[in-house]
């Protein structure tokens, strides 16, 4: 748990060598960047809310690596963190986001009409489609650093705003503290709710403090539009449904997200955003669009093929296990989504998923017949 602010002056009594973390066995982006010299340069800085370098890196110190994905190993505690600790964050962002430079500008496109196709992904292979993003409310600290009062204020504000949604987005808020364990587990199993805070990344960064205080889920009546409140980000906005109509999912996502932003503005709150980093979120891996468009897809043959990883890489896609980031694939079902978040617009990322998934299905059909997929190998996108 972060506690460095109160101890930062105490730490200064010890030399840089005494305080520098042992990163010798680490495989994360932070550990690649944080040299002794950089630690020395940044260790006495803090943001105006008191977030320090040790708060930024603690999750990456405590979690050397991950078997399935290269983790980032650092978090922001407020909007200022990305500026105050830019000498650490900029190279991490460049490394994680495919060479995104400190001078680059991000683009946003939430017009679902610009998406080509996507309403006809084969439902025999695509079990469900989902698009999610995160949003942070300007003026509050982020989850690794916010106080109980801030968290409760974010919950109150969000529930009031979401309560104004109408039509097929009309819904209700369910606070975690009012749910039984069984109700919570059912929502988790149905992929509607975030897991209980057992992930070491959540725990070490301090995001799980005071759990389940001021956490909850808001969803519309048919559970196709959901908002998680106060998990890894202030808000996680999710549009999802069974089958392969990604166009419908993305259209609902854009409509709902735009309405939510308007409702917050009417209360004089805006989302954290800047021209360079796009939407500001807790984890540097989610900067930019914060968008992950994913499908649960059955690929029992391609999933075992030696070229599966290379195909995904060329399509700028990534795979996760069936149950999400910390899990393995079950029954040949993978969670396949865009690998990028920053430097591409929302429409461009969903387009990559739609086009890529069509090719994956074509390859799977070939392999079912025992045929080669060599001529289908895509060029690098």
UniProtKB/Swiss-Prot annotation:
Residues 125-367 form the Phosphagen kinase C-terminal domain. The keyword Cell cycle does not apply. CDD domains: creatine_kinase_like (cd00716). It is found in: Cytoplasm, Cytosol; Mitochondrion; Cell membrane. It catalyses: creatine + ATP = N-phosphocreatine + ADP + H(+). Creatine binds at residues 72, 232, 285. Expressed in almost all tissues and found enriched in various region of the brain, retina, heart, gizzard, gut and sperm. The keyword Kinase applies. GO terms for biological process: ATP biosynthetic process; phosphocreatine biosynthetic process. One of its GO terms (molecular function) is ATP binding. Keywords: ATP-binding, Cell membrane, Cytoplasm, Kinase, Membrane, Mitochondrion, Nucleotide-binding, Phosphoprotein, Transferase. One of its GO terms (cellular component) is plasma membrane. The modification Phosphoserine is found at residue 285. InterPro entries: ATP-guanido_PTrfase (IPR000749), ATP-guanido_PTrfase_AS (IPR022415), ATP-guanido_PTrfase_cat (IPR022414), ATP-guanido_PTrfase_N (IPR022413), ATP-guanido_PTrfase_N_sf (IPR036802), Gln_synth/guanido_kin_cat_dom (IPR014746). Coiled coil: none annotated. Pfam families: ATP-gua_Ptrans, ATP-gua_PtransN. Its EC number is 2.7.3.2. Ba-CK and Bb-CK are phosphorylated. Residues 11-98 form the Phosphagen kinase N-terminal domain. Transmembrane segments: none annotated. ATP binds at residues 128-132, 191, 236, 292, 320-325, 335. Reversibly catalyzes the transfer of phosphate between ATP and various phosphogens (e.g. creatine phosphate). Creatine kinase isoenzymes play a central role in energy transduction in tissues with large, fluctuating energy demands, such as skeletal muscle, heart, brain and spermatozoa. Belongs to the ATP:guanido phosphotransferase family. Dimer of identical or non-identical chains, which can be either B (brain type) or M (muscle type). With MM being the major form in skeletal muscle and myocardium, MB existing in myocardium, and BB existing in many tissues, especially brain. This is Creatine kinase B-type. It comes from Gallus gallus. The lineage of its organism: Eukaryota, Metazoa, Chordata, Craniata, Vertebrata.
């Amino acid at each position: 748990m972060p506690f460095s602010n109160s101890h930062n002056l105490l730490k200064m009594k010890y030399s840089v060598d005494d305080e520098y973390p042992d990163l010798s066995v680490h495989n994360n982006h932070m550990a690649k960047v944080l040299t002794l010299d950089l630690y020395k340069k940044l260790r006495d800085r803090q943001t105006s809310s008191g977030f320090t370098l040790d708060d930024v890196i603690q999750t990456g110190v405590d979690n050397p690596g991950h078997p399935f994905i290269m983790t980032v190993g650092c978090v922001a505690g407020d909007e200022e963190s990305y500026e105050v600790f830019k000498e650490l964050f900029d190279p991490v962002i460049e490394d994680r986001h495919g060479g995104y430079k400190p001078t680059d500008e991000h683009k946003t496109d939430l017009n679902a009409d610009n998406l080509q196709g996507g309403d006809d992904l084969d439902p025999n292979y695509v079990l469900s489609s989902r698009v999610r993003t995160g949003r942070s409310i300007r003026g509050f600290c982020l989850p690794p650093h916010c106080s109980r009062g801030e968290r409760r204020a974010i919950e109150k504000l969000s529930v009031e705003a979401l309560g104004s949604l109408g039509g097929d987005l009309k819904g209700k808020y369910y606070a975690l503290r009012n749910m039984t364990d069984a109700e919570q587990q059912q929502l988790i199993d149905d992929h509607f709710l975030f897991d209980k805070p057992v992930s070491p990344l959540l725990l070490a960064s301090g995001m799980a403090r005071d759990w389940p205080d001021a956490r909850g889920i808001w969803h519309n009546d048919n559970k196709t539009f959901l908002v998680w409140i106060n998990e890894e980000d202030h808000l996680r906005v999710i549009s999802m449904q069974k089958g392969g109509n990604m166009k419908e999912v993305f259209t609902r996502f854009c409509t709902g997200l735009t309405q939510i932003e308007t409702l917050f503005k009417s209360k004089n709150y805006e989302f954290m955003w800047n021209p360079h980093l796009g939407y500001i979120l807790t984890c540097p891996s989610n900067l930019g669009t914060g968008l992950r468009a994913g499908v649960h897809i059955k690929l029992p043959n391609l999933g075992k093929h030696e070229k599966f990883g290379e195909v995904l890489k060329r399509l700028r896609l990534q795979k996760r296990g069936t149950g999400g980031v910390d899990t393995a694939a079950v029954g040949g079902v993978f969670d396949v989504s865009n690998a990028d978040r920053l430097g591409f617009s929302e429409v461009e990322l969903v387009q990559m998923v739609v086009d890529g998934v069509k090719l994956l299905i074509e390859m799977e059909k070939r392999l079912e017949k025992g045929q080669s997929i060599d001529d289908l190998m895509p060029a690098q996108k």
